[in-house]
UniProtKB/Swiss-Prot annotation:
One of its GO terms (molecular function) is structural constituent of ribosome. PANTHER family: 50S RIBOSOMAL PROTEIN L32, CHLOROPLASTIC (PTHR36083), LARGE RIBOSOMAL SUBUNIT PROTEIN BL32C (PTHR36083:SF1). It comes from Thalassiosira pseudonana (Marine diatom). SUPFAM superfamilies: Zn-binding ribosomal proteins (SSF57829). Belongs to the bacterial ribosomal protein bL32 family. GO terms for cellular component: chloroplast; large ribosomal subunit. The lineage of its organism: Eukaryota, Sar, Stramenopiles, Ochrophyta, Bacillariophyta. Residues 1-25 have a biased composition (Basic residues). GO terms for biological process: translation. This is Large ribosomal subunit protein bL32c.
Length: 54
C-alpha cells in the first residue's frame, strides 16, 4: 500500500486548499451570473428552451 514518506507542510496544504476554494468560488460566481442573466432575459451565451413541449 502506498504511504507518503514525509508530512506535507502547512504552507503547501494551505496553498492547495486556497486554490481549491478559489476555483469553487469562481465556479459559483459564474453559475450565479448565468442564472441572473437568464432571469433578466439578457443571456447571449446560453441556449435553452422557454417552453417544454409535452
Amino acid at each position: 500500500m502506498a504511504v507518503p514518506k514525509k508530512r506535507t507542510s502547512k504552507a503547501k496544504k494551505n496553498s492547495r486548499k486556497a486554490n481549491w476554494k478559489r476555483k469553487a468560488a469562481k465556479s459559483a460566481q459564474k453559475s450565479l451570473s448565468l442564472a441572473k442573466s437568464i432571469l433578466r432575459g439578457k443571456t447571449t451565451s446560453f441556449v435553452y428552451r422557454l417552453y417544454v413541449d409535452e
